[in-house]
Design a protein with these regions (language model features):
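N-terminal export leaders
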Residues: 13-17
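Beta-lactam-recognizing serine transpeptidase/beta-lactamase-like catalytic domain environment
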Residues: 2-5, 218-228, 268-319, 324-599, ...
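Conserved, well-ordered alpha-helix/loop/beta-strand core segments that scaffold catalytic motifs
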Residues: 223-261
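Short beta->alpha transition motifs characteristic of CBS
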Residues: 60, 76-81, 274-280
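N-terminal secretory signal peptides
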Residues: 1-11, 21-27
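Short, small/polar residue-rich loop motifs at catalytic or cofactor-binding pockets
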Residues: 57-61, 211, 256-260
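Aromatic-capped interface at the extracytoplasmic side
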Residues: 33-55
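Small/polar-residue-rich segments within soluble enzyme cores
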Residues: 97-101, 116-236, 529, 547, ...
Length: 646
């Protein structure tokens, strides 16, 4: 009996301990539940909300690039695309295979996606394919239940309506590379593009705008159910250029078959009205995504379509440099306009012969400075160069803009080369030779200039020696256009012509005598309009009521052999293209009241006469359209926040 009682007491104690433990555990659980559901309810509601709500950045509309009259050179249009979120897929490669059965996915697109998956975080959307048709986009939407991690998206894509004709100016946008990442969250967005070349690159931050955001309700699989709220971003600023698109297009078509460059510039304000480099490329191809094969084709092209020859092509200026040598002689007092030299076609310095281009005709005979320029007598300029020395020639060249960059609103501008005695000694370790001075006097030897520099040189000759500098943007600080974009000459109480006069007043003189400038520019008029000028075949038609002044230039790319000289020089038709001389012509018009400077350089074009023929056609169009006389978008026109149609 006692044993049974002991057992009962032990059992009761165990039950009490077990019951107490259960009660304690229940109390702890109840307390924890109270803590979670009551005391911490707000915190967990917020976390639950965050799991249900997805915040997404919205790319703002990129600013437009417009010409001086408001024509769109870079715009935006609706872009149907597909993005992929790696962590939501059952396997990226498998998902791409399924997607490729619905819409076209090319090997280079697939390879790019697989590369980006490795370098990006798994929750960051990756652009798969863009610019789908509506039918393709609809097919993807129908198949979405079988495509986890795939998201159809509608955004804006960049479009270049003028294509290759303005490519070297406008540039292009392309995908963000790892080197481009700067911490701006916009750069992480799928399919986001940044400027990689031209105006698109130089003004990228201004064109880019500020991001907006969207609060989206999503389900457990991350799919969007609805948009709860949206805050639009700030559209990018528009950039208005000085270019006249109609003129640009006509010049581009005229040079389409050449490896060439042309620049048209207002001589007083420095506005670039046209800048053409041929051959060109389609900037839309870069926006869509260029294949490796297409890229190699462009890079290996013998005529270098990716290079803007107007600012990066460096050529011996040839006889277009003779005006600089003449001015250096006049300013230094070593020769006046009446200084005469007898040209028999060749001179000798030691054992070396220096020829004139008219050597096979017995030379030019007696020529003065005006005739020396008009007839492009090499012997005359050998004589001036010998009297001057290379350093005085170089000093005058630099006053006219050669040997420097201007900071124009483009990438890749080159400085060319104006040599000196010190330069040669520092670079080669060999002293300067007198023969090199003679060759410099006709624009050869080490001299190099870009077409843009030659345009600036010509503008400074024609505008009375004012140090005008080229510019490509009318509103470098961006801004919006108002209304429909039709600009007027007077906006916000400001007169555009008054602005131009103020701009002229700020330009400094290069310090060259007006009388000496007139001697040289009169000679340039005789080049085209004189009876014996080297470009007399290419004077402007009488119905234009204006005359053009200019200077031919033929730049050798290799030395003429004795056999070739004996045969009368190189015959371009019989010479391989790469060995033909470059053809140059620089001009201004109208004579008497100059406004425009034009330069044409044709690689391996044969002779300056060929470039003169092209320049005649271009200057004719310039004077007929007279872009500086027409109302353009004012420098401060418009307002921010302009709405765009896409």
């Amino acid at each position: 009996m006692e044993r049974d009682g002991s057992r009962h007491k032990a059992f009761s104690r165990r039950m009490a301990l077990l019951g107490g433990s259960q009660l304690s555990l229940a109390a702890v659980l109840m307390g924890r539940m109270y803590y979670l559901q009551v005391l911490e309810s707000d915190q967990y509601k917020m976390l639950a909300e965050e799991n249900r709500i997805s915040m997404r950045l919205l790319a703002p509309p990129r600013g437009l690039v417009l010409d001086r009259f408001g024509q769109e050179l870079a715009s935006n249009r609706q872009n149907y695309r597909v993005v992929l979120i790696a962590e939501q897929t059952k396997g990226v490669a498998e998902t791409l295979d399924r997607l490729a059965r619905i819409i076209p996915i090319y090997p280079h697109q697939r390879s790019r996606v697989l590369r980006e998956v490795k370098r990006k975080r798994p929750f960051v959307p990756i652009n798969v394919v863009e610019n789908l048709t509506w039918e393709q986009f609809a097919r993807v939407n129908v198949q979405l239940p079988d495509l986890p991690g795939v998201q159809p998206d509608v955004g804006e894509g960049r479009f270049y309506p003028k294509g290759a004709e303005t490519a070297h100016i406008v540039g292009y946008v392309s995908s963000v590379s790892e080197a481009d990442l700067t911490g701006d969250p916009l750069l992480e967005l799928p399919g986001f593009r940044i400027g990689k070349n031209g105006v698109e690159k130089v003004f990228d931050e201004s064109l880019r705008g500020k991001a907006g955001n969207s609060r989206m309700e999503v389900n457990a699989y991350g799919r969007v159910i609805r948009e709860l709220a949206r805050q639009d971003g700030q559209p990018g600023n528009d950039v208005v250029l000085t270019v006249d698109t109609n003129l640009q297009e006509k010049i581009a078509r005229r040079l389409a078959d050449e490896s060439a460059a042309a620049v048209v510039m207002d001589i007083h304000q420095g506005e670039i009205l046209a800048m053409v480099s041929s051959p060109s490329f389609d900037p839309n191809a870069f926006n869509l995504g260029l294949s490796a094969k297409a890229w190699r084709t462009l890079v290996r092209h013998p005529r270098h379509p990716l290079v803007n020859k107007a600012i990066a092509g460096q050529y011996p200026p040839g006889s277009t440099f003779k005006m600089i040598v003449a001015l250096a002689a006049l300013e230094a007092g070593v020769a006046g306009p009446g200084h005469r030299v007898f040209c028999k076609g060749v001179i000798k310095l030691g054992n070396t012969k220096f020829h004139c281009w008219r050597n096979r005709y017995g030379g030019h005979g007696w020529v003065d400075m005006k005739q020396g320029i008009a007839q492009s007598c090499d012997i005359y300029f050998y004589d001036l160069a010998r009297r001057l020395g290379v350093d005085r020639i170089g000093a005058m060249a630099r006053r006219f803009g050669l040997g420097e960059t201007f900071g124009i609103e483009l990438t890749g501008e080159k400085a060319g080369l104006v040599p000196s005695k010190d330069w040669k000694l520092a670079v080669t370790g060999v002293p300067w030779q007198l023969g090199e001075t003679l060759i410099t006097g006709i624009g050869q030897a080490y001299l190099l200039a870009t077409p843009l520099q030659l345009a600036v040189m010509t503008a400074r000759l024609a505008n009375g020696g004012m140090a005008v500098r080229p510019r490509l943007s009318r509103r470098p600080d961006g801004g919006k256009l108002s209304g429909d974009g039709a600009g007027s000459a007077v906006e916000n109480g400001r007169d555009e012509d008054d602005d131009a006069r103020k701009s002229d007043a700020a330009v400094q003189s290069i310090g060259v005598s007006a009388a000496n400038l007139k001697i040289v520019t009169d000679a340039m008029s005789d080049v085209v309009n004189g009876a014996r000028g080297t470009a007399r075949k290419y004077k402007l038609d009488k119905e234009l009521g204006a005359k053009m002044a200019g200077k031919t230039g033929t730049a050798q790319v290799r030395r003429i052999t004795k056999a070739e000289r004996k045969a009368g020089g190189k015959l371009s038709k019989e010479t391989p293209w790469k060995e033909r001389d470059h053809a140059l012509f620089t001009a201004f018009a109208p004579v008497g009241a100059p406004r425009y400077a034009t330069v044409v350089v044709v690689e391996h074009g044969g002779s300056g006469g060929y470039a003169a023929r092209l320049t005649k056609d271009i200057m004719t169009e310039v004077l007929r359209s007279d872009p500086m006389a027409r109302s353009a978008l004012g420098p401060d026109s418009g307002e921010r926040g302009r709405k765009r149609e896409i």
